Amino acid sequence: MNVQAIIKDIESEYLKTDLPTIHVGDTVRVGVRIREGGKERVQPYEGTVIAMRNGGINETITVRRVFQGVGVERVFLLHSPRVADIKVVRRGKVRRAKLYYLRNRVGKATRIRQRFDRPV
């Protein structure tokens, strides 16, 4: 076995299998595990997926939302133990693989059309 096959074999046991199919433009709710003091809770973070990077265990999504007039982006490792769950709230119809142009838009210009041909 070569090195890449060994790494892939080791990584495969850490991959999550219960992830929904996520596309760029979708609005998702990500449950993030937060530890405060001695307690652990799940904090939801809802926003639009503006970028995806595939790469096995290093697969990430960038989620953007506007909070109190300020744009906030977070990058989530999909297979991380910190990510409790991911739920697709609505499907978006876009023609780009990366939606970085939304950073320069304000208000109603950031809206994305809804897609009805994919189930939520």
From Swiss-Prot:
* Pfam family for this entry, one: Ribosomal_L19
Per the entry, what this protein does is: This protein is located at the 30S-50S ribosomal subunit interface and may play a role in the structure and function of the aminoacyl-tRNA binding site.
Check the record and name the InterPro entries matching this protein: Ribosomal_bL19, Ribosomal_bL19_CS, Ribosomal_bL19_sf, Translation_prot_SH3-like_sf
Task: Please state which protein family the record places this protein in.
Answer: Belongs to the bacterial ribosomal protein bL19 family.
Keywords in UniProt for this one? Ribonucleoprotein, Ribosomal protein
Output the Gene Ontology cellular-component terms.
cytosolic large ribosomal subunit
What GO MF terms are annotated? structural constituent of ribosome
Protein name as annotated: Large ribosomal subunit protein bL19
Q: Which organism is it from?
A: Crocosphaera subtropica (strain ATCC 51142 / BH68) (Cyanothece sp. (strain ATCC 51142))
PROSITE patterns in the record, alphabetically? RIBOSOMAL_L19 (PS01015)
Which biological process annotations from GO are given for this protein? translation
